[in-house]
Amino acid sequence: MDKQIQMVQQIVDDMLAKRESLRVLEAGCGSRSFIQFGPKAYLVGIDISAEQLQKNNLLQEKILGDIQEFPLQAVNFDVVICWDVLEHLPQPEMALNNFLQTIKPGGIIVLGAPVVSSLKGLATKYTPHWLHVMLYRKVIGNPLAGTPGYGPFKTFLKSAMSPKGIRRFAVENHLRIDLLESFEGVMQQTVRRKYPLVDLVFRAVAPLVRVLSFGTVTPHTTDFIAVLRKPAPDARDRQAEPAFAGTTVLNTAH
């Protein structure tokens, strides 16, 4: 995931270089941020967990609320970041529409989430929550997993937050896709590295899964990252271009 974070960091750095300041919303902010913004940025975080907000020392402003329903001020932010949150929402399309109306022209929406159609995504969606907690404690090594304010949290993995759903959202709302890339996440990498037998079985089963699912299930790509840009007013005046024109779209999954 470091590569994907670096790609987003470069996009943010380019914005910082061209502007005197940035207003940034960390949606579902938790207690930390993956991206560095520096002194030019005013950071606002929203989360449903008071414990997570209390532990986050990077924010200038904290909002206790649900990103699906909280009335975010219109045209208010240059950057909206939503990382590993959409999968936990029963109505992710509500959050996406909330981001759309609060982002300024020329601003970006950064999304990171599991691939719904991956083996990890399907296993996460259809296995009990207690199993997720056990994996976080035993495999990742987080003894606080599942306690109040700590993940893993309940997941829904709705189709609206799949890479295909995000592409559709971008096209329908005239957003440019600056980046859309799928990759193998830390959890699966850790399990395969820590348990060689699991890795052996995975390597044997993965090709069969791809064939039997007609390519719709992606064993190796578990997560994706997307950067959607709201066109500036002058861009809207020019002749309309395809949503993918001049963008980086790599290794995407359905």
Q: What would you call each of these model-derived segments?
A:
Residues 73, 116, 130, 233-235, ...:
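Intrinsically disordered, low-complexity segments enriched in proline/serine/threonine
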Residues 33, 52, 118-119, 186-189, ...:
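Flexible, glycine-rich phosphate/dinucleotide-binding loops
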Residues 1-75, 79-83, 96, 159-160, ...:
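Conserved N-terminal segment of class I S-adenosyl-L-methionine
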Residues 90-99, 108-227:
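S-adenosyl-L-methionine-dependent methyltransferase catalytic module, highlighting the catalytic core
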Residues 28, 106-107:
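Conserved phosphate-binding and hydrolysis motifs of nucleotide-dependent enzymes
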Residues 232-254:
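Intrinsic disorder/low-complexity segments
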Residues 84-88:
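Short catalytic micro-motifs in class I SAM-dependent methyltransferases
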